[in-house]
C-alpha cells in the first residue's frame, strides 16, 4: 500500500509562540542547550494505489497546510 509522510511547518519568518513556550520549558527542565523549537504537524497518508507526488502536493496545499503561513515537505513513507 503506497504511503506518504507530509510534514507541515510554519514558515521560518512566522512567529511560533508554541515553539517558544516549549523551548522555555526545556530550559526550565535543565536542557539549557535547547536554543529554539519549531512546532509542526505530521501526516501519514496511505493510498489504495500509487499516486504522483504532484497529486499529493495538491492534497497538502489544499487541505493540510495554510500556504500563507505554512510550508510542507513530502517524503515517501
Indicate residue ranges for each PLM-predicted region.
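Non-catalytic terminal accessory/regulatory regions of metabolic enzymes
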Residues: 1-77
Amino acid at each position: 500500500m503506497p504511503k506518504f509522510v507530509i510534514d507541515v511547518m510554519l514558515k521560518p519568518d512566522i512567529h511560533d509562540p508554541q515553539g517558544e513556550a516549549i523551548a522555555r520549558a526545556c530550559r526550565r527542565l535543565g536542557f539549557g542547550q535547547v536554543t529554539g523549537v519549531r512546532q509542526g504537524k505530521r501526516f501519514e497518508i496511505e493510498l489504495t494505489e500509487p499516486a504522483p507526488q504532484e497529486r499529493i502536493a495538491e492534497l497538502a496545499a489544499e487541505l493540510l497546510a495554510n500556504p500563507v503561513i505554512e510550508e510542507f515537505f513530502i517524503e515517501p513513507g
